[in-house]
Structures are given as structure tokens and as C-alpha cells.
Swiss-Prot record:
PANTHER family: REGULATORY PROTEIN SSL2874-RELATED (PTHR38449:SF1), REGULATORY PROTEIN TM_1690-RELATED (PTHR38449)
Family of the protein in this entry: Belongs to the RemA family.
Organism annotation: Carboxydothermus hydrogenoformans (strain ATCC BAA-161 / DSM 6008 / Z-2901)
Record-given protein name: Putative regulatory protein CHY_1489
Pfam families according to UniProt: RemA-like
């Protein structure tokens, strides 16, 4: 299996193969997931002090906060997969 990476903003890159979901941080259950990850030391804040717009949940139970919209991250992920299929 080939390792694929995706830019989540400000030069931060994560492994696309390990992403479980990309969600908005607005709902109470997601806020709870963020809080629990912070308590467990599994939270990665990649916002550079800006507002959190996307929460990326990884298969390793890490939770990553991004300042990029969830739709943008998903689009980058889909674009990357489509480019690789064409080669």
C-alpha cells in the first residue's frame, strides 16, 4: 500500500490513508471528542491560533484540529486520489 499525504493547512501534512473522518467542530459530540482527546494527550492542534474549522479523526485515535474547512480537506483528499488513478 502506498502512503498518501494531504495538506491540512499552513504546511501541515497528515497521512491520508489513516483518516477515518473529517467533521465540523460545531456539534456537542465532536466537542466532547476534542475534550477527551485533549485529556488523553491525543489532540494535535494544527490551527496556528486560528479558528478550528475541521476536526480530523485518525485511526490511531488522534484528533487533529485544522483551520481549513472540512469540504476543502475532503476535496484535497479526493483530488489526490483521482490524480493517482490517472497515472
Amino acid at each position: 500500500m502506498e502512503i498518501k499525504f494531504i495538506n491540512i493547512g499552513f504546511g501541515n501534512i497528515v497521512s491520508a490513508n489513516r483518516i477515518i473522518s473529517i467533521v465540523s467542530p460545531e456539534s456537542a459530540p465532536i466537542k466532547r471528542i476534542i475534550s477527551e482527546a485533549r485529556d488523553k494527550g491525543m489532540l494535535i492542534d494544527a490551527t496556528y491560533g486560528r479558528r478550528t474549522r475541521a476536526v480530523i479523526i485518525m485511526d490511531s485515535d488522534h484528533v487533529i484540529l485544522s483551520a481549513v474547512q472540512p469540504e476543502t480537506v475532503a476535496h484535497r483528499l479526493n483530488t489526490k486520489e483521482n490524480q493517482e488513478e490517472n497515472f
